[in-house]
Amino acid sequence: QTHPTSAQALAGFERENSLGIDRTAFNRVYRDKTSKPELLCALSDFEMLCGFAPVTESLARAEQNGWLELARHLKLTGIEKTVRWALEEKVHKTPSNLPQHLRKVAELYPNSGGLLVALLMNYVVLKPGDAVYLDPGNVHSYLGGVAVEVMSSSDNVMRAAFTQKHID
């Protein structure tokens, strides 16, 4: 998931209003006009994916693990188009050699393009008391642990995978 910047929130809010989408509708993404920065403070060991790893790192990891289709797309099209491809294709074979932190996700969401996107992201482990600040626009996913989120008063969330909620 990610949260919009102020400009994205305002434009999205106005667009959805002009389309007549009710503010409480399941498919409403921009429920208000504000951005949503957040600060997360770990209360226990806390695992998350946060932002995209450098392309060279992702490419090396993909090639080392035999994720050849992912490596090919990344090499030919770059990160943005690879993410779009992964999410727009409805079914992908679950990659082999998944890192430990993604195996539970793969059980819950097998053959999801979100798994390919997750392989391109930074894996972060926070210890109790550690914190991370997430600017609007920073893609992130929480994998496990207990933490407190402090964020602005906004309900704007854009989701891409690993959820039963509306995906935009």
Language model regions located:
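Active-site region of the double-stranded beta-helix
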Residues: Q1-D130, H140-D168
